[in-house]
């Protein structure tokens, strides 16, 4: 090929697929054999990474079941969303209705006709699982509990909870009230991610309200057994059995386990502990790409600049079996040609991360800067180069930065 033809070919820097090699910053150990998940007694369960949402183990996790007081995770989620929107404040004084006072089951022991700070009611919902507190919060936010249930269901739809329907704020039994282990795990992950300050309530081990002589203890006994556990919620009714969603954070990795329909308190605790131990022992999570990190610099036709940097709009994390990080591969998928004008944030292509041909993550590649369309004569010059490139040029891979990731500490 002549030097002039080669120069033209060098202008064709966009490709259908440019391979990206993943390299760890430290040497990875040999891949481990991941055994089957532990034996779990609960009717359904799930174990997932709380950040990547990768499912590590599950059985019948999408089955709709009575959630009992796991319902209150959504009750507190709705309250946290209303707080974030500025429609309510923690200092608001909430009137206690007859309905709230008379609600059966576990109680915070609020009294009819009094007013209680919203901050205290939310502790009553989260820490002591008070049905009375849940109704009071629901009525204050939505005017009536059934209207609050509508809000809960709208949030459930927005979060993609496909096996969930609420009819009350407390989780008291109702044939039309149900959820699944998977939905409860996703809800908990969203609560932790979106409202971290509110989530801190779930780590509190006790709450003493008013004239109650002794503080009531958090029913999540794993808060005492495992220092890495920082929430989330228990549930119990005759129809639901013993339920538990638990989250633990170790060395920057967060796992969430949900069990529903266990036959005893000790069984649900043991099931959750086994799932967490399995997840932390056999899986690891890595940061692959940072928010805004340039992953490629493809050629742009008809622009005032020749290239545009592209990246993703989030930090991309991947959960894999221990020792398999080096087996990951990533592919950047770009169109054959990219034309100006381009606005910052425009979708230009995708990056796809795979392990053993299974897609683990796929994210849009967005332009990191604007590319303005060039003038008339410059565009005509590009027309000529595109024509000549079609005759003599050959495509080349787009430039791409190599991601790095630190090996997680032993857990």
Where do the model's predicted regions map?
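Intrinsic-disorder/low-complexity regions
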Residues: 9, 28, 48, 398-400, ...
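Active-site-adjacent loops and short helices of periplasmic peptidoglycan-processing enzymes
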Residues: 7, 29-196, 212
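Bacterial N-terminal signal peptides
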Residues: 15-24
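Bacterial N-terminal signal peptides that target proteins for export
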Residues: 2-16
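Domain-terminus/edge residues, biased toward the C-terminal soluble/receptor-binding domains
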Residues: 161-162, 173-411
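Bacterial Sec-dependent signal peptides at the C-terminal "C-region" and cleavage site
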Residues: 23-32, 366
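Residues embedded in well-ordered secondary-structure elements
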Residues: 18, 34-36, 83, 237, ...
């Amino acid at each position: 090929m002549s030097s002039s033809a080669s120069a033209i070919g060098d202008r064709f820097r966009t490709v259908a697929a440019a391979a990206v090699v993943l390299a760890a910053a430290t040497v990875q150990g040999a891949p481990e054999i991941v055994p089957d998940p532990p034996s779990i007694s609960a009717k359904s369960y799930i174990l997932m990474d709380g950040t990547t949402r990768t499912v590590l183990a599950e059985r019948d996790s999408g089955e709709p079941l009575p959630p009992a007081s796991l319902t209150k995770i959504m009750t507190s989620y709705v309250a946290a969303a209303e707080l974030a929107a500025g429609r309510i404040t923690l200092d608001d004084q909430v009137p206690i209705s007859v309905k709230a006072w008379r609600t059966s089951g576990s109680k915070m022991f609020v009294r009819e006709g009094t007013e209680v700070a919203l901050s205290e009611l939310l502790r009553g919902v989260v820490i002591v699982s008070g049905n009375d507190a849940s109704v009071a919060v629901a009525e204050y936010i939505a005017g009536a509990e059934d209207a609050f249930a509508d809000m809960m269901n709208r949030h459930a739809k927005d979060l993609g909870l496909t096996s969930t329907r609420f009819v009350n704020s407390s989780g008291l039994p109702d044939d039309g009230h149900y959820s699944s282990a998977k939905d409860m795990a996703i809800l908990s992950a969203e609560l932790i991610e979106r409202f971290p300050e509110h989530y801190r309530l779930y780590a509190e081990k006790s709450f003493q309200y008013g004239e109650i002589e002794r503080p009531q203890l958090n029913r999540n006994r794993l808060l005492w057994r495992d220092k890495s556990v920082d929430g989330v919620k228990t549930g119990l009714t005759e129809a639901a059995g013993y339920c538990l969603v638990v989250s633990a954070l170790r060395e920057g990795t967060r796992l969430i386990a949900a069990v529903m329909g266990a036959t005893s308190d000790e069984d649900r605790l043991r099931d959750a502990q086994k799932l967490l131990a399995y997840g932390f022992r056999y899986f690891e999570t890595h940061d692959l790409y940072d928010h805004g990190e340039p992953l490629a610099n493809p050629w742009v036709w008809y622009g005032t600049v020749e290239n545009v940097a592209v990246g993703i709009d989030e930090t991309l994390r991947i959960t894999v079996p221990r020792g398999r990080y080096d087996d990951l591969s990533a592919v950047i998928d770009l169109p054959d040609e990219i034309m100006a004008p381009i606005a910052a944030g425009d979708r230009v292509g995708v990056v796809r991360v795979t392990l053993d041909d299974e897609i683990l993550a796929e994210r849009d590649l967005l332009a990191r800067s604007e590319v303005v369309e060039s003038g008339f004569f410059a565009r005509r010059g590009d027309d000529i180069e595109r024509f000549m490139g079609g005759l003599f040029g050959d495509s080349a891979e787009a430039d791409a930065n190599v991601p790095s990731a630190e090996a997680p500490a032993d857990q």
